[in-house]
Amino acid sequence: MKTDIEIAQSIELKPIVDVVEKLGISYDDLELYGKYKAKLSFDKIRAVESNPVGKLILVTAINPTPAGEGKSTLTIGLADALNKIGKKTMIAIREPSLGPVMGIKGGAAGGGYAQVLPMEDINLHFTGDMHAITTANNALSALIDNHLHQGNELGIDQRRILWKRVVDLNDRTLRHVTVGLGGPLNGIPREDGFDITVASEIMAILCLATDIEDLKRRLANIVIGYRYDRTPVSVGDLQVEGALALILKDAIKPNLVQTIYGTPAFVHGGPFANIAHGCNSVLATTTALHLADYTVTEAGFGADLGAEKFLDIKTPNLPTSPDAVVIVATLRALKMNGGVAKDALTEENVEAVRAGFANLKRHVENIRKFGIPAVVAINEFVSDTEAEIAALKELCASIDVPVELASVWADGAEGGVALAETVVKTIAENPANYKRLYDNDLSVQEKIEKIVTEIYRGSKVNFEKKAQTQIAQIVQNGWDKLPICMAKTQYSFSDNPNALGAPENFEITIRELVPKLGAGFIVALTGDVMTMPGLPKRPAALNMDVESDGTVLGLF
């Protein structure tokens, strides 16, 4: 079997102008980045707003193994299959972060015969959006430090600056740094740190903003820190939201590419789901809904993280809610959640599949709490056995959830036809009745408790002293009506990454609460979740190279 990059490089791409013609998009509507990538103009985005709204399919997953369960691959393959059965379909997914690409993932543009192309460009610098977000973020840091150096007219307490610098790499050495050293000419010394770009609030803002004016409003609302009198300081106080928006004026426009089978795809924005809201841009998803009859999108990690945030944070900003949720399950992840060691996941173990099903069952129950029908997609691997597949299908039947085997990685669009037909049938026969998990008028504690007890199935939430102080500050400033964005391990329903399966009666500890007023939510930090990842012992970068003719090697 060819590698992902070998498959991608064997495909003859169509000019992006030809790919999007069937959507009613012309050459004049595009801002081209070469022959195969483009941004969609704001004029076209506004022109299609009066079009009917299509069906929305959200793809999520069970709690994953470290390698991931192929959610992006399934998203792409399902869209290709929907087009194959005659449904006018678009994809709306996130742009990969270079950090994980160089670290553990080696690429994040799908896999096998279910990829978005050109995958090398998408995984590397693409249209420059990540760099624009990085630059805007760090421009704000420079402007803050300059304000301190030039007399600090706003009275900013340099010990209470929340804003950090960012870089789109995994670099643990940058988590805590000191800036302004070297004497009076080099600024005011203070503690600082770096996050990964996709953890920046500006990334979340870009993915939730609806136009330039909304972008500026959200940027102005960013709280960068506090004064000596403990009152908040915003970007609006610094009067630099216009400059930041200027840096982002092109990055806010959605990017258009294609799949191996020529399905048009928006790839735009990329916040992590364990430390941010984990969804592609509202602008891309909304525009896709106006252009196609079906839009397939995804939310990061398991349904306890990405899907909950999609439904509680992103959906209220969309013209419609999901008509169906596809939960991706793999037998290896079920076996891991059933207690099997990572090095034994390829061995047949029907009992472990049965034990791990408790994890999938809980995700199905949780999606149903939002009033949306669920469909289970078994992402097929060569190590799967007939006995394991039969056991999983039997278990899904026991909770009355449709289930289909999908082999889109190996077989492309054809391998997703059965899943596509089941999803279309489910949408037709089971209309969604979407409802949010909580009301924003609940207190901060009540909203967190609702997520922990109803989605994670924990018994209690403990708030550390720092978090309690921050809640009081949030209430005092009138920010307590914002939704909650949980920062939690992706491997477990709990805040303990080793508590696999479907743990119950556990307690979750909230160590810190960070107001993200520009994004419009409050981040609740649990466990040891890092906003700047580190590299593994053997990074994927060690296998990467480029030949003299520019051919890329080692992405997968």
Curated annotation (Swiss-Prot):
Name of the top EC class for this enzyme: ligase
Family: Belongs to the formate--tetrahydrofolate ligase family.
GO biological process: tetrahydrofolate interconversion
Gene3D superfamilies, per the entry: Domain 2, N(10)-formyltetrahydrofolate synthetase (3.30.1510.10), Formyltetrahydrofolate synthetase, domain 3 (3.10.410.10), P-loop containing nucleotide triphosphate hydrolases (3.40.50.300)
Pathways involved: One-carbon metabolism; tetrahydrofolate interconversion
Keyword set, alphabetical order: ATP-binding, Ligase, Nucleotide-binding, One-carbon metabolism
Binding site for ATP: T65, P66, A67, G68, E69, G70, K71, S72
Protein name stated in the entry: Formate--tetrahydrofolate ligase
Enzyme Commission number(s): 6.3.4.3
PROSITE patterns in the cross-refs: FTHFS_1, FTHFS_2
Record GO terms (molecular function): ATP binding; formate-tetrahydrofolate ligase activity
Catalytic activity: (6S)-5,6,7,8-tetrahydrofolate + formate + ATP = (6R)-10-formyltetrahydrofolate + ADP + phosphate
